[in-house]
Amino acid sequence: MNSTKPRVRFAPSPTGELHIGNARTAFFNWLYARHYGGKLILRIEDTDRQRSTRAFEARLIDDLKWLSLDWDEGPDGKGEVGPYRQSERLDLYESFLKNLQKDGRVYPCYCTEDELELERTSLLSRKMAPRYMGKCRNLTEADRRRLEAQGRRPTWRFRVSQGPVLFQDLIRGTMKFQGEAVGDFIIVRSNGTPAYNFAVVIDDHFMEISTVIRGEDHLSNTAIQLMLYEALGFEPPEFAHHSLILGKDRTKLSKRHGSVSVREFREKGILPEALLNYLALLGSSIGEGREVCSLEEIITAFSLDRAGKSGAVFDEDKLLWMNSLYIHEEPAIKLIERLRPFIEKAGYDVNKWETPWLDRMVEAVKPNLTTLADIGSYVKMIVEEPVRIDEDAAAVLRETETQMVLRTLLQLIEEGKFSHEDFYSQVMTALRKVTGARGKRLFMPVRAALTGTTRGPELDKIFVLLGEQSVKERLKKALNMQGNFS
């Protein structure tokens, strides 16, 4: 099945939001296809009738599109080896179950969930790995009729042969599993739907998948799938198992570690380019020592040889840092469109503002943004009255010298001796001459009065955004409030 043009697949289950680890798997498959000029197939594994929904499928597809991870074949109508939803391929799975039944490679199992749990508990108490012990492996026809008369509906289990299962992993090298350690596994559930490993083998074969790239938590599944490939007479694809994303406690990343879905990072205001850049470098040597790489550079440099074998710890602080770099480099026109939904979510109607003012506002706050969602607090600081004074700003306003600086500034502005072309520079130069204040003693009182904080956009830009009238009003309010800080 190996070819010069690889066919890889991303096959998520629409049972919840797209996990960041699954997004990384999708990205690796996408990179592999784009690097080698192959094709990426999107397959929806929706045989879990209770948990799979079209709503989750739609959100999953939307997240992939947001990441710009396009596919060449999938449920949207592209491709000739569909359908690309497993729920639409049930007849195919049933036909191959019949083949395995005919060949004696499978048998019906009537064990209940309670019986299986009891067996599992017993094995664990003896410090043995849980596996099916073959209770129903050699039932007679009479046994089966008796159990079915009790209303039991069978699952179908694959007869596992003893002996080693070996395969060459493209990332990890030679891998070896013992068949007897696996136990006879279910390939079809009692409701007639195929189990994961059975459906995957059939789908990968008929979709002509050449390379399966997925997380290391699927290593044991690969051993199971290779048994099925042999039984069905299919040539197996190549396999590559990349490392998992870990939390700071070095356990598999989960909700208890914080944000874990692509949707959550979208809502936090992470840029897709920043997220992909971070995921590409996480636990790999693709960046060759560089922190920031363009998507084109990542495609060119991508190789499974550079994918890490050891689990990689997810560092959200580093992602935020990387995101800030992307925001700061984003052209204002493009950034405004990305900020628009976050401004509106914060409760402001962007359409009420004139375009030149909006452009200036975004340029002013851009160096201070870590995420797109940060824009809300800066808009509030600029457009809402009265401005909220935080504790650090209040401490500045308590200082004796502050009142003198602010009163002098207000007086200078009201005298109206400055041109509007370079208003800020002229008025601050005059303020420095009159008060003798320099550095923080000059600028910090002004910042605290106008913005309510001691950090933020450059003051000259704040002056322009607020306008002369608003600057005067905020100075007056700060002076009137000083009695409350004493």
Curated annotation (Swiss-Prot):
Motif 'KMSKS' region in this chain: 252-256
UniProt-listed PANTHER family: GLUTAMATE--TRNA LIGASE, GLUTAMATE--TRNA LIGASE, MITOCHONDRIAL-RELATED
Subcellular location: Cytoplasm
Catalytically driven reaction(s): tRNA(Glu) + L-glutamate + ATP = L-glutamyl-tRNA(Glu) + AMP + diphosphate
One of the record's GO molecular function terms: tRNA binding
Highest taxon of source: Bacteria
InterPro entries xrefs: aa-tRNA-synth_I_cd-bd, aa-tRNA-synth_I_codon-bd_sub2, aa-tRNA-synth_I_CS, aa_tRNA-synth_I_cd-bd_sf, Glu-tRNA-ligase_bac/mito, Glu-tRNA-synth_I_codon-bd_sub1, Glu/Gln-tRNA-synth, Glu/Gln-tRNA-synth_Ib_cat-dom
Binding site for ATP: K255
Function (record text): Catalyzes the attachment of glutamate to tRNA(Glu) in a two-step reaction: glutamate is first activated by ATP to form Glu-AMP and then transferred to the acceptor end of tRNA(Glu).
Record-stated family: Belongs to the class-I aminoacyl-tRNA synthetase family. Glutamate--tRNA ligase type 1 subfamily.
Lineage per the UniProt record: Bacteria, Pseudomonadati, Thermodesulfobacteriota, Syntrophia, Syntrophales
Any one GO cellular component localisation term in the record: cytosol
EC class: ligase
EC number(s) recorded for this UniProt protein: 6.1.1.17
CDD domains: GluRS_core
Organism: Syntrophus aciditrophicus (strain SB)
Gene name in the database record: gltX2
Subunit structure: Monomer.
Keyword entries, A-Z: Aminoacyl-tRNA synthetase, ATP-binding, Cytoplasm, Ligase, Nucleotide-binding, Protein biosynthesis
Protein name: Glutamate--tRNA ligase 2
SUPFAM superfamilies (alphabetical): An anticodon-binding domain of class I aminoacyl-tRNA synthetases (SSF48163), Nucleotidylyl transferase (SSF52374)
Example GO BP: glutamyl-tRNA aminoacylation
Motif 'HIGH' region in this chain: 12-22
